Amino acid sequence: MIYQKQRNTAETQLNISISDDQSPSHINTGVGFLNHMLTLFTFHSGLSLNIEAQGDIDVDDHHVTEDIGIVIGQLLLEMIKDKKHFVRYGTMYIPMDETLARVVVDISGRPYLSFNATLSKEKVGTFDTELVEEFFRAVVINARLTTHIDLIRGGNTHHEIEAIFKAFSRALGIALTATDDQRVPSSKGVIE
């Protein structure tokens, strides 16, 4: 199933769709480094993502990065509500040469982000690295996930961020994996 949403504000105009059919993705955020990271997200999560975004990137990349995270989170929440029967938990360690990242995801209905990653530099190209945390906070809060992101070993800043995105994507993909178990994956009987 394809989940689609538009978001139009004074700062950004977004048209985003997500599906779990692994169809080809098209990503145009206007921010080259973010395009690269979201391409990795689609490959490693097994999700298809189509993004057409325009924003005030002449100011900086903050609004478009955060707003894309908000919409991806909202679409993931819709997908989760429709799935009902899924693994729920996902954990992944990803090395990227000298760096090592760990991400743990719980599709809990309780939004929480622990972001324990001191990135080596403030920029990768023109991209402000503090936006990595802003992006994940937007996704996690809007998808209602509990997520722990830890950069265990650092080095090259591009590698650090890439390892984090890959680990999150793989952990999310595991957590979203469908199961034959007809019970809601919570002893409460509900995930809200």
Curated annotation (Swiss-Prot):
EC assignment: 4.2.1.19
Pfam families: IGPD
Principal cellular location given in the protein's record: cytoplasm
Metabolic or biological pathway, per its Swiss-Prot or TrEMBL entry: Amino-acid biosynthesis; L-histidine biosynthesis; L-histidine from 5-phospho-alpha-D-ribose 1-diphosphate: step 6/9
Domain of life of the native organism: Bacteria
Single GO biological process annotation from the record: L-histidine biosynthetic process
A cellular component annotation (GO) from this entry: cytoplasm
GO molecular function: imidazoleglycerol-phosphate dehydratase activity
Enzyme class, first EC level, given as a word: lyase
Reaction it catalyzes: D-erythro-1-(imidazol-4-yl)glycerol 3-phosphate = 3-(imidazol-4-yl)-2-oxopropyl phosphate + H2O
HAMAP family the record matches: HisB (MF_00076)
Official protein name in the record: Imidazoleglycerol-phosphate dehydratase
UniProt organism field: Staphylococcus aureus (strain bovine RF122 / ET3-1)
Lineage: Bacteria, Bacillati, Bacillota, Bacilli, Bacillales
Name of the gene encoding the protein in the UniProt record: hisB
